[in-house]
Amino acid sequence: MKARTPKPGRPARLSRERIVETALNCDLRTVTMRDIAERLGVSHSALYRWVGNRDELLDLVGEVVVERILPTAEPTADTWRPWLTDLAWRMHDQFLAVPGYAAHVALPHRHNAQAFGRLRNRVVSAFKLAGASDDLAEQSWYIFGQGVVQWLGARQMGHDLGPDAPRFDLFLGVLLRGLPAREPGS
């Protein structure tokens, strides 16, 4: 997504980075553009010169979070499971570090196609390296993504997962032992 540039005039007090950093410290479930402008000490109309609306703001936040969670190394046929484990723990740490982010991502909505597309492509690639067909790699991505995001979202929203709810490490271990998805009976 191309960042907007401010109109000519006074030197900018805003930047994409300042806006995103401010948003990363707000509860993303409830934050408004007016809240962000107030925290930045600018008018909300000045903020709109940089970010068109709340959805665009959340897209920018998604780009930063996905950049933070993607491991620098690519998965291989020998490392796909540890790679996915590392990715899931990065998701755990980053999604829960941003107030309301895991809860936001867990709700049905339009995700940032570019950022989440990069995440999806890397995870699908890992499952293909594990021997999954194209279709089963896509199915495995869905199971992995939904499983991790829903667990994190429920935790962040304060839903009681019950007294016997598994710790994230146990949940992740069981999830990854069942992936990549396989055709029934195979």
Regions found by a protein language model. Give the residues of each.
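Short, basic, alpha-helical segments at the C-terminal edge of helix-turn-helix-like DNA-binding modules
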Residues: E63-I69
